A protein has these predicted regions:
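Conserved C-terminal alpha-helix-loop-beta "cap" of PLP-dependent enzymes
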Residues: 11, 15-85
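Short, surface-exposed loop/turn motifs that are enriched in glycine and acidic residues
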Residues: 1-3
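Ligand-binding pocket scaffold of soluble enzyme catalytic domains
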Residues: 7
C-alpha cells in the first residue's frame, strides 16, 4: 500500500511536468521522476522544494530528480503542481 501511494504521487508530478511541456530525461514509472527544466526554472523551484540536479542537458537545460515517498502528501504535490503552472 505504501509503495502504491508514493508512485501515485510521482505520476501526478509526471503529468504536471508533461503538461508544462517539460520532457522527461528518463521515462520512469517509479516514485522518481526526471524532468528536464530550464536553468531558470531550476533556480526558482530550488528555493522552495528539495530535488536533485541530475545532469546538465545543455547550456540552458538541466535534468533533475524529484522523488516522492510514503510521507509525500496530496498537499505537497498540489503545491508543487501549482508552482509549476505559475512558471
Amino acid at each position: 500500500e505504501i509503495g502504491r501511494q508514493e508512485v501515485a504521487q510521482a505520476m501526478r508530478l509526471r503529468e504536471a511536468f508533461l503538461a508544462k511541456g517539460w520532457p522527461l530525461f528518463v521515462d520512469s514509472s517509479s516514485n522518481q521522476q526526471f524532468p528536464v527544466l530550464t536553468n531558470g526554472d531550476v533556480a526558482v523551484l530550488r528555493h522552495k522544494y528539495s530535488f536533485e540536479v541530475w545532469e546538465k542537458v545543455d547550456q540552458a537545460h538541466t535534468a533533475v530528480r524529484f522523488c516522492t515517498s510514503w510521507s509525500t502528501t496530496d498537499g505537497d504535490v498540489d503545491a508543487l503542481i501549482a508552482d509549476i503552472q505559475k512558471l
